[in-house]
Structures are given as structure tokens and as C-alpha cells.
Swiss-Prot record:
The lineage of its organism: Eukaryota, Metazoa, Chordata, Craniata, Vertebrata. Coiled coil: none annotated. GO terms for cellular component: cytoplasm; nucleoplasm. This is Ribosomal protein S6 kinase 2 alpha. PROSITE patterns: AGC_KINASE_CTER, PROTEIN_KINASE_ATP, PROTEIN_KINASE_DOM, PROTEIN_KINASE_ST. The modification Phosphothreonine is found at T359, T571. It comes from Xenopus laevis.
């Protein structure tokens, strides 16, 4: 569900109701809940209805897959639509029980439905359907798999002002669109900003939003989360759209510093700080960031940035946003700093397992009073795009080829049948398996977690497995000391196997293969990920077509993501600006190792044999000596007809100094890649496939058997130095 507050989806908000004309009520009174008898509610007029003739949806059009969250008023489910025009599409279904909603909450729910029906923006969650039964209300919304942006980043990623700028810019566009429709958001806080699978933001949860407010009018409700409230909301002087820009400043401050600008020991003190305290501006922030924050934290709302008729245009012109291309941002053409670790369409990795492990069940609702049903007249809704699709009788998309969802109580063997062994490694065994429900074939890697922790491998596959040339992760089961990692099945076999057995293979085809593999590696390197085991046996074909686009990079068991000392991931911007040179040097070494492995592959594709292993009689010491010398032949055999550009590229990818090798990006820019249509198409000769594969295996076996280089550390970290420190006499008098 695109609501991040999954433990308590609809929390009680301290609300003091007063006469809007005089705005009675003090900040101190805002710290308590009014009693049931004191509640005074105005019902808003219902102005939105579904056009007559539009086809409505009901709960029978959806299959429940998982519970995403649960609160006192209802549940949030992951659902799949089973009827056209959008059959098989996944949604989040928010189900509210009418009988448990107070009149005030019923009004807010209807208001949320009305607002969502009106809003169509790339950075605001979309309402697709709304309908009701006698006892319940249903909102069918975008299913956002990336989770809550701010708490997720605070737990996983180190980010910079440049990264914060991206999210704030998307948020500014979303808020500006709401304001242009006369909507005050009024509940801007970290939990209500979620990520989609690409890493773009979506504003969600409009239960406290106020509709139909123009710049001449004000709202007077005391609502929202107190730490993010603007002063005029706290003191009930009446508020307009400018209150959202104060909250926007609070979010900006929190993202840049990790703390809130105004936070007391309780609600009363927090409100007093908001009204009176001087802002302590951290001096490590850039001048541009400080300037924007000061312009947003104006206690007089008429002086606040964004309060004028221009709205967000004032904010967009700020020097802090000078590097943002607003048109590209709106079109989602700018790359987010962080991509969530999600795999298939129904992945709930970022949702609380307390809920996702439950069996999804929509219990019958108790019928409410007759007046409650009257309040929700006109609640039903079908998104216009869906009505148009249905009118055109658009054919249903193919059924998603993903396994059925499973709870933590279901075992791997309950879902899959295991077949023959595909491969055996030091810490794992790989087998073919068949999904019992769909009869589809997959591969399962069974890992002994007492020998190796596979969490990094699994996270990398979750985050990057949707790349077309990286093996796709389907499922993960954790049972005792065994972890079952289910992936797509590589039916086409190993890359080198196929090339060496191919009747005809040319230099031009070799360039196409390297381009596909290298663009995938470049994508990983740009995100701070190194594979570190790119031997040819880990590059396979997903099918028998032999098409370079069917190539998959597999086995990320030795892969690493660049992390800070505290274990958090680092965005590319953070890496470039704040990472120590020795860390970058190590990262460059690992990237160089990946390029060296691709150089070995390229040499073998062109020559028909490996560069450093000559035969079965070679010892590991001999192979390592040749590798260490950096010498290999580019004469004789196929090399007499291979292009000069190919020889140049091989030499630069196999340079003995890893820091002098080409980067993946530079390989992609080399003329042998960019001008491959001009390369020779004559057949390349090769040795017997078994001899070549044996030599390749011997090369990597020799590398793995070599002793690692000693890691130098400061003298003070040695055991001897530590022992000496303990023996030093005390000088304390």
C-alpha cells in the first residue's frame, strides 16, 4: 500500500475544533484529544460523482495476494486485478470499515477519494478505482514497492546535498500541482513520501488534505504531525498553501542534518519552539542550502518563500536548484540517486513481515448507520484512462510469470519440486526446480549460510536483477541453515561453450557480445557494485537463441556494494565527494579486476585460446608468472587477420596495472565497440572446446590458489602495540 505508516495506518490526530471565525484555542490545548462530546464536525458537500455509464469495479474484480498493513479502521492489501482492461495489474487496496470511522474520519476519507480522483501527476500516487459495499469503503491505488524514502535512506544509504536536491525537486513539483488544484496537503512528513521501483518519489495519504482553498481563503483546522506544523497552524491564525512550504523546509532540514529543526521534550514544548525559537543553522550546509532554509522558515506566512501567487516558481529559481533541469525531472528522465532493492512485480521487501506473513482475508464489514452510507454517495470511481481502455476493448496483458506469493511459514519444498543438479560450488549447490502451481522451470541456488553469508548477493540481485542482462531473482526462502535463492533458468548454457561450439563466429559478433556484457558491468560500476568473479562460466545465455541480448551475468556470490565505514551504502555523488582516496583506490582495483576478466574473455573469443594458460601441463605457478608479467601474444593464428582496434582494446583491458586499465565506460567508447559494423565478418578459428575450457578453468584456479596480498594497517592496531599500551604506567596524579 502506498502508505508508509503500516503499523498504524490511521493514527489519531490531536484536533481541537473551534469557531473558524475567531480561531479559539491555544497551542497548549492542542496537546490533548477532545472528548467525544466536544467534537464538532462540519460535513463537506460531495461534489464528485462517477459519470453515468462508466463501468464500476467491485471487490470481486481483485484477488488478494498479501496483507501490507493493518490499523484499527481497516487493512491494506496487495491485490491483482483479474478483469479487463487491466487484468493482472497489481494494486494496493485500502479497505476501511464504515462502522469504525467517526464522522470526522468519514469526511476525511471522502475528501481523500475526491482529491485523488482529481490529481494526475508523476509524483503523486494515483487512484485507479473507488467503490463501496454496505459496510466498507475501497480505494484502489498504485502499489509502490520501494518503501518509505526517508527512513529507508537513513537505514541504507549515505547521501549528499546533491542527492537531497533531487528528492526535494520532485517533491516541489508534486506540491505545486496540488496547490494549483486548490489543495493544501497539510500532512507533509517522511512517512508519506514513498519510492517507486525506479527510485522516484510519490506523495501519498491525503486524509488530512484540505480541498478548494484559493490564495484568498484560509483553513483553520489544527491537524497534522506537530513537528512539521507551520506556526500559523499551531496558533490557529488560519493557514493556506504556504503552510506546506514550512513543512517542506522541515523535511529539507531533516534530510540534510538527520534531525528536526524544532523538537521539544513533549508536544507543548515543540509547539512553543515552532512559534518562538531561533533556528540553529548548521554551518556544514552549503550557502545555497542555508539560504533556501531561511527563506522557507519565515514565521510570517506572507513572507515565506512559495507563498506568493507564483508558488513553486519562486522555489525553482533558488540557487540551490540551479543544476536541476525541471522539464527533464518532470518527464522522469533524471536518474534517482538510489534504486530500491526490489525484484518481481509483487515484491514486498520493504513492508513489515508482521503483516506480509499473514493470510490475506477481507472480513465482512458491519453495516454502519444509514447516515454514513448517505455521506459516501458518489464514492465510486473509475480512472478515466481505464474507462477509455475498456471502451476500446483493449486485450489483456499476459499473465505475470512470477511464482505465487508465500508466507514465512511456507517451505521451499511446498512450492517447488527439485530436479537435477546443475552445478556445485564451495558453499552452494545449484539445481533445476519446477514451480508446482505454474509448472514453470527455474534454477535454485541452495546456500549453506554457516559457510557464507549471502545477504549481499541477495540484496544486489533485488536491486539490480531487473536489468535485462542480469539474472533475475524470483524468490528467497530461509530455512534453518539453508537459504534457497530462486532465479530464472539459464537454458542456453555458458557463453564460452556456445561460442566455441558455434559453426561460424566472427570478430563483429565478438564485438556485439562484449558490448552487451560491458554495458551491464558499466551499469553496476556506476552504482558502486563490483562483481569480482566475472569468469566466462558466470556469463550464460537465458535461451537457445544465441542473441547477445539473451546474455545474463550470474553468480554474484563475491560481488560487493561500496559501503561506508558504518555499513551504509553510498550514492555515486557521495562516493565522488566524500570517500577516502584509499577506498576509491580499492574500488578501482576491484573494477579493474572485472575489466581484466572481460579482457580474458575478449582475448579467448578472438584468438580461440586463452592468453596465459597454454595447456593441461601448466602449473598454477607458471600461469601466475605469466599473468604477473602481463605478457601475452598478439601474433600468429587469428591475430594475423584480427583488426588493429581489437588488439589495442585487448592490450588496454589486460594491462598489468589495474589502475591503468580501461574503465567499463571507456571500453564502451572504444572504436572497436562503436564502429563494429565495419569489423570483419570472416570466421575465427579456435581450439577444441574442451582444451579452451580446461585452460580457462586452470587460469582462474591459479588465481584463486594464490596467497592474498598482506593488508597493511596502522602500527597502533597491531597486537604488540596494543599490549604495550596496556603495560604503560599511569601518569595520573
Amino acid at each position: 500500500m502506498p502508505l508508509a505508516q503500516l503499523v498504524n495506518l490511521w493514527p489519531e490526530v490531536a484536533v481541537v475544533h473551534e469557531d473558524p471565525e475567531n480561531g479559539h484555542g491555544s497551542p497548549e490545548e492542542g496537546g490533548r484529544h477532545t472528548s467525544k462530546d466536544e467534537v464538532v464536525v462540519k460535513e463537506f458537500p460531495i461534489t464528485h460523482h462517477v459519470k453515468e455509464g462508466s463501468e464500476k469495479a467491485d471487490q470481486s474484480d481483485f484477488v488478494l495476494l498479501k496483507v501490507l498493513g493493518q490499523g484499527s479502521f481497516g487493512k491494506v492489501f496487495l491485490v491483482r486485478k483479474i478483469t479487463p482492461p487491466d487484468a493482472n495489474q497489481l494494486y494496493a487496496m485500502k479497505v476501511l470499515k464504515k462502522a469504525t470511522l467517526k464522522v470526522r474520519d468519514r469526511v476525511r476519507t471522502k475528501m481523500e477519494r475526491d482529491i485523488l480522483a482529481d490529481v494526475h501527476h508523476p509524483f503523486v500516487v494515483r487512484l485507479h478505482y473507488a467503490f463501496q459495499t454496505e459496510g466498507k469503503l475501497y480505494l484502489i491505488l498504485d502499489f509502490l514497492r520501494g518503501g518509505d524514502l526517508f527512513t529507508r535512506l537513513s537505514k541504507e544509504v549515505m547521501f549528499t546535498e546533491e542527492d537531497v536536491k533531487f528528492y526535494l525537486a520532485e517533491l516541489a513539483l508534486g506540491l505545486d500541482h496540488l496547490h494549483s488544484l486548490g489543495i493544501i496537503y497539510r500532512d507533509l512528513k517522511p512517512e508519506n513520501i514513498l519510492l517507486d521501483e525506479e527510485g522516484h518519489i510519490k506523495l501519498t495519504d491525503f486524509g488530512l488534505s484540505k480541498e478548494a482553498i484559493d490564495h484568498e481563503k484560509k483553513a483553520y483546522s489544527f491537524c497534522g504531525t506537530v513537528e512539521y506544523m507551520a506556526p500559523e497552524v499551531v496558533n490557529r491564525q488560519g493557514h493556506s498553501h504556504s503552510a506546506d512550504w514550512w513543512s517542506y523546509g522541515v523535511l529539507m532540514f531533516e534530510m540534510l542534518t538527520g534531525s528536526l529543526p524544532f523538537q521539544g521534550k513533549d508536544r507543548k514544548e515543540t509547539m512553543t519552539l515552532i512559534l518562538k525559537a531561533k533556528l540553529g543553522m548548521p554551518q556544514f550546509l552549503s550557502n545555497e542550502a542555508q539560504s533556501l532554509l531561511r527563506a522557507l522558515f519565515k514565521r510570517n506566512p506572507t513572507n515565506r518563500l512559495g507563498s506568493a501567487m507564483e508558488g513553486a516558481e519562486e522555489i525553482k529559481r533558488q540557487p540551490f536548484f540551479s543544476t536541476i533541469d525541471w522539464n527533464k525531472l518532470f518527464r522522469r528522465e533524471m536518474s534517482p540517486p538510489f534504486k530500491p532493492a526490489v525484484t518481481q512485480a509483487d515484491d514486498t521487501y520493504y513492508f513489515d513481515t508482521e503483516f506480509t506473513s499473514r493470510t490475506p482475508k477481507d472480513s465482512p464489514g458491519i453495516p454502519p448507520s444509514a447516515g454514513a452510507h448517505q455521506l459516501f454517495r458518489g464514492f465510486s470511481f473509475v480512472a478515466p484512462a481505464l474507462v477509455e481502455e475498456d471502451a476500446k476493448k483493449t486485450s489483456s496483458p499476459p499473465v505475470l510469470s512470477v511464482p505465487k506469493t508465500h508466507s514465512k511459514n511456507i517451505l521451499f519444498m511446498d512450492v517447488y519440486t527439485v530436479r537435477e543438479t546443475i552445478g556445485v560450488g564451495s558453499y552452494s549447490v545449484c539445481k533445476r526446480c519446477v514451480h508446482k502451481g505454474t509448472n514453470m522451470e527455474y534454477a535454485v541456488k541452495v546456500i549453506d549460510k554457516t559457510k557464507r553469508d549471502p545477504s549481499e548477493e541477495i540484496e544486489i540481485l533485488r536491486r539490480y536483477g531487473q536489468h535485462p542482462n542480469i539474472i533475475a531473482l524470483k524468490d528467497v526462502y530461509k530455512e534453518g541453515n539453508s537459504i534457497y535463492v530462486v532465479t530464472e533458468l539459464m537454458r542456453g548454457g555458458e557463453l564460452l561453450d556456445r561460442i566455441l561450439r558455434q559453426k561460424f563466429f566472427s570478430e563483429r559478433e565478438a564485438s556485439s557480445v562484449l558490448f552487451t556484457v560491458c554495458k551491464t558491468v558499466e551499469n553496476l560500476h556506476s552504482q558502486g557494485v563490483v562483481h569480482r568473479d566475472l569468469k566466462p562460466s558466470n556469463i550464460l545465455y537465458v535461451d537457445e537463441s544465441g542473441d547477445p541480448e539473451s546474455i545474463r551475468i550470474c553468480d554474484f556470490g563475491f560481488a560487493k556494494q561500496l559501503r561506508a565505514d558504518n555499513g551504509l551504502l553510498m550514492t555515486p555523488c557521495y562516493t565522488a565527494n566524500f570517500v577516502a582516496p584509499e577506498v576509491l583506490k580499492r574500488q578501482g582495483y576491484d573494477e579493474g579486476c572485472d575489466i581484466w576478466s572481460l579482457g580474458i574473455l575478449l582475448y579467448t573469443m578472438l584468438a580461440g585460446y586463452t592468453p596465459f594458460a597454454n595447456g593441461l601441463g601448466d602449473t598454477p605457478e607458471e600461469i601466475l608468472a605469466r599473468i604477473g608479467s602481463g605478457k601475452f601474444t598478439l601474433r600468429g593464428g587469428n591475430w594475423n587477420t584480427v583488426s588493429a582496434a581489437a588488439k589495442d582494446l585487448v592490450s588496454r583491458m589486460l594491462h598489468v596495472d589495474p589502475h591503468k586499465r580501461l574503465t567499463a565506460k571507456q571500453v564502451l567508447q572504444h572504436e572497436w565497440i562503436t564502429k563494429r559494423d565495419a569489423l570483419p565478418q570472416s570466421q575465427l578459428n579456435r581450439q577444441d572446446v574442451h582444451l579452451v575450457k580446461g585452460a580457462m578453468a586452470a587460469t582462474y584456479s591459479a588465481l584463486n590458489s594464490s596467497k592474498p596480498t598482506p593488508l597493511l594497517q596502522p602500527i597502533k592496531s597491531s597486537i604488540l602495540a596494543q599490549r604495550r599500551v596496556k603495560k604503560l604506567p599511569s601518569t595520573t596524579l
